[in-house]
Amino acid sequence: MRILFLAVFIVNCCQNCFSQKIVSGIYSSGLNLAFDEITGRVTGFYDNESGYDEKTGTSQFSCTFYFSGTVELKKGKIVSFYPGDSVPDSIPGKLELGINEQLTIRLNSEHGGCWNVQSFTADPVSFSLYKAVSWSQIRYVTGSNVDLFMDERGTSALNVKLPFGSVLGISVIKGDFAHCALLDSTNDVIEGWIKLNDLNAMD
């Protein structure tokens, strides 16, 4: 009987291990992340700040980067860069899935400003899921003054113009359009449909 219970326990542990998956959504400390279960691709955007400049009334330092990669089982390789930067400026790293909807990210070198906010090279940085969101991709705007539309036909534009580098959570893709939500630091949720041609390409 003991052997039977032990066997059941081991099987359950293995099932729990392999059933773990990355959850798309908003994580702690300024991380937004999306995971496409079909392709195994993970995309994300980290944006955090520290310090306070009394003269300008803004933060002194900022750490910002976009990343993408693929995940198999619980580990993945990512490439990170500032939205719009060229490929030679990218920094590789690793993403690893933890327990209880946590994950860690570690980069081979620091992005500008990150050392004063959060180091990603000394040790893996841990993030906890704050809110699950049904995103399959996170992408950014590559044009300037880009329109958002009311539907996937693109017949009626909203009174919104997105500047270059705006980061979006993508939930649905239909034809040449994607339904998206603008990721920013305000409580206002701006949603609409955007042309795929106005977004960074997914290799």
Model-predicted regions and their roles:
Residues 23, 40, 115-155, 160-163, ...:
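SH3-family beta-barrel domains
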